[in-house]
């Protein structure tokens, strides 16, 4: 059902009933696997499917994600190397493979799950390059107009991936900044076009899911303490 529709019958968002936890040995083993193998194994674990690395490579191509070194020890992950030049196409083609070619939904948990699998694949590339390990966490930065990847990073970190801070970058529109620092979020504001159009949206995609996940995590931490 989660691959066929974005929301449940009651309008709520789908979340995993049981969250997998990857051991340190499993994380260390990522460097021995290809990007496609990492993606296949994570999706199989989440959806109880039997994808192979060849299934993933046939769907998304040999190099669907490329890492570009920038100054200040920054690495850009380009997730748009596909015929449509968008990350959404990567999500669509993998979700379609999981559904066996049947029509369905590409948003919601399906998109979050693909994002998690892609992050595991990227961290496998990092490990092979000696960039990261368990004692050396990597911060992730994304623009604030779309919270699908921050949501995926949140789950991936909780499941064992060595992710440090998850940074959501705002521009001068600053609606998200007001929400985080002042507890206010206005939906009647007018966005000013900038050089970062994805951050110009008034309400970022999947912001509600990210807030819910954050609150659940804070509540769990308070119970532990």
Segments predicted by a language model, with ranges:
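PLP-dependent amino-acid enzyme catalytic core
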Residues: 1-225
